[in-house]
Amino acid sequence: MASQLPPYKQDFLKAAIAGVLKFGSFELKSKRISPYFFNAGDFYRADLLRAISLAYAHTVIEAREATGLDFDVVFGPAYKGIPLATSTTDKLAELDPARYGTTCYSFDRKEAKDHGEGGNIVGAPLKGQKVLIVDDVITAGTAKREAIAKIRKEGGEVVGIVVALDRMEKLPAADGDDSKPGPSALGEIKKEYGIPIFSILTLDDIIEGAKSFASAEDIKRTEEYRAKYKATD
């Protein structure tokens, strides 16, 4: 329930409602038509960016306290992950300067640069480093697999992923029959790579929080979507 969330998650949920959460009909990469869309690219206002970066930083700190999560570099996959990585690194240093005061960040280019410093990576070198990926959501998992492959190619070790939203959504069935139960992309990446994934909010949180401003029809459509596509993990 949104009312039971920690203050930083409540602030993030309010920011999401104010700036990035939209209801309507949105085609996803999976070709499903979602009744809601969460676009972290819309966190371009200073107050909204502060709310999301604080939420990421608090989530990271809680993950360290709960699981011992340890990392050297915060990595943001281009493009939406870039401001998330830089602002989260800054907020980590602000909240716990003794531990995170010298933490580095890095991000990738969509296309390798063949002049100047060259390469695919901007920011801290990844070789021999423990890397934490921060991004907005995991829907199909394709972008996260690409990011993991790039980090490994550079000699880094991915030790975890933090996302803003867990859609709690199962992967599309190989035979196109979405009536079958199935795992989420988030769960499959956890299993495939053996790394922990942490989320600030879940779809359940979004639905509960949206009841204060969304129409009854939007809430109903989102709840029906959740029931139809909810993952088994």
From Swiss-Prot:
Binding of 5-phospho-alpha-D-ribose 1-diphosphate, residues: 29, 79-80, 109-110, 113, 115, 135-143
CDD domains: PRTases_typeI
UniProt-annotated binding residues for orotate: 37-38, 139, 167
GO process terms (BP): 'de novo' pyrimidine nucleobase biosynthetic process; 'de novo' UMP biosynthetic process; pyrimidine ribonucleoside biosynthetic process
Signal peptide bounds: none
Catalytically driven reaction(s): orotidine 5'-phosphate + diphosphate = orotate + 5-phospho-alpha-D-ribose 1-diphosphate
Disulfide bond annotation, renumbered to this chain: none
Any one Gene Ontology cellular component term annotated for this protein: cytoplasm
Gene that encodes the chain: PYR1
Keywords: Glycosyltransferase, Pyrimidine biosynthesis, Transferase
GO molecular function: orotate phosphoribosyltransferase activity
Family from the record: Belongs to the purine/pyrimidine phosphoribosyltransferase family. PyrE subfamily.
Iron-sulfur among keywords: no
Described function: Catalyzes the transfer of a ribosyl phosphate group from 5-phosphoribose 1-diphosphate to orotate, leading to the formation of orotidine monophosphate (OMP).
Top-rank lineage group of the source organism: Eukaryota
SUPFAM superfamilies membership: PRTase-like
Annotated EC: 2.4.2.10
Designated name of the protein: Orotate phosphoribosyltransferase
Pathway: Pyrimidine metabolism; UMP biosynthesis via de novo pathway; UMP from orotate: step 1/2
